[in-house]
């Protein structure tokens, strides 16, 4: 199935080849908490920006391992390109994943999905 979504103004849009998430992830790190994002994770090959990537802004902090993409016009956090961290914060040093803000999916009510909490506040 194809999932589509975009930021509020539509300048940052995307397409995912995959299923709607069975669960979402809420990270408690300072950045994710302030953004209010609910993450759905996909393999990089499943995710495709449908608007020019050059239009996105990217924020990196702390270890600089995670690229947080957001729309420079409306400010919505759209997706991250990050290591495929395990819930305990470990990483195999090569596998990456795309975390997509499920609140931006078209035709999906994110609050209806179960949420897993990652203790990002204490992990990184």
What are these regions (language model features)?
Residues 1-6, 11-124:
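A short Gly-Trp-Pro
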């Amino acid at each position: 199935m194809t999932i589509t979504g975009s930021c509020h103004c539509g300048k940052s849009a995307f397409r995912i080849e995959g299923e709607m998430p069975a669960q979402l992830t809420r990270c408690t790190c300072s950045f994710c908490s302030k953004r209010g994002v609910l993450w759905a994770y996909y393999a990089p090959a499943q995710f495709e920006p449908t608007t020019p990537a050059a239009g996105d802004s990217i924020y990196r902090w702390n270890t600089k391992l995670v690229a947080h993409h957001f729309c420079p016009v409306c400010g919505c956090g759209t997706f991250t390109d990050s290591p495929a961290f395990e819930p305990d914060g470990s990483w195999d040093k090569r596998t990456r994943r795309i975390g997509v803000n499920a609140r931006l999916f078209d035709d999906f009510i994110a609050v209806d999905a179960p949420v897993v909490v990652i203790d990002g506040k204490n992990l990184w």
